[in-house]
């Protein structure tokens, strides 16, 4: 999928919003764990604390946000940019692909919770489009 110039501007704006939230990734993961408790099974090393304040959740959340940032910087070559991550999740970790959609929901909710009306429908749409493409790349090796 190609992103239009307008999409790219809005995606970068959405990324700017996400990136400004302290511990955005940890907060999004904690939301996902709360809404979809089955996702906790992939993170036994987190112990029993799946809150955004857990240092391990924060650390993994930062990895998630950094990976999204890499995707945003390489919108025209997401496959190459995210190939290693896709390989790891598909072959090594064997993450159920539906979990990526759960994470998208949690990320979008995190941005909306922090920015309200500033997270306009246009930015929301572009962010979903971008995250959807990132997920598409991440699950591409499952076939």
UniProtKB/Swiss-Prot annotation:
Supply one GO molecular-function term: haptoglobin binding
Tissue-wise expression? Red blood cells.
Q: Which GO terms describe its biological process?
A: hydrogen peroxide catabolic process
The record, for PROSITE patterns, names:
GLOBIN
Kinase in keyword set: no
CDD domains named among the record's database cross-references: Hb-alpha-like
Task: Report the residue ranges that make up the Globin domain in this protein.
Answer: 2-143
A single Gene Ontology CC annotation of this entry is: hemoglobin complex
> Where in the chain are disulfide-linked cysteines found?
none
Instruction: Specify which residues bind O2 according to the UniProt entry for this protein.
Output: 60
Q: Which UniProt key words apply to this protein?
A: Heme, Iron, Metal-binding, Oxygen transport, Transport
Offer one Pfam family short name for this entry: Globin
Q: Which of this chain's residues are annotated to bind heme b?
A: 89
Q: What does this protein do?
A: Involved in oxygen transport from the lung to the various peripheral tissues.
Record's family? Belongs to the globin family.
Assembly and interaction partners: Heterotetramer of two alpha chains and two beta chains.
> Any idea what this protein is called?
Hemoglobin subunit alpha
**Which organism is this protein's natural source?**
Lepidosiren paradoxus
């Amino acid at each position: 999928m190609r992103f239009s110039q307008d999409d790219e501007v809005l995606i970068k704006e959405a990324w700017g919003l996400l990136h400004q939230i302290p511990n955005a990734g940890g907060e999004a993961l904690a939301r996902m764990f709360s809404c979809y408790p089955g996702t906790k099974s992939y993170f036994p090393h987190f112990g029993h604390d799946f809150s955004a304040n857990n240092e391990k959740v924060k650390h993994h959340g930062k990895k998630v946000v950094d990976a999204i940032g890499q995707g945003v910087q390489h919108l025209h070559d997401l496959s190459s940019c995210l190939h290693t991550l896709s390989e790891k999740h598909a072959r090594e970790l064997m993450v159920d692909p539906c979990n990526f959609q759960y994470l998208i929901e949690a990320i979008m909710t995190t941005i909306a919770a922090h920015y309200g009306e500033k997270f306009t429908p246009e930015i929301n749409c572009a962010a979903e489009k971008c995250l959807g493409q990132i997920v598409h790349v991440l699950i591409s090796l499952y076939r």
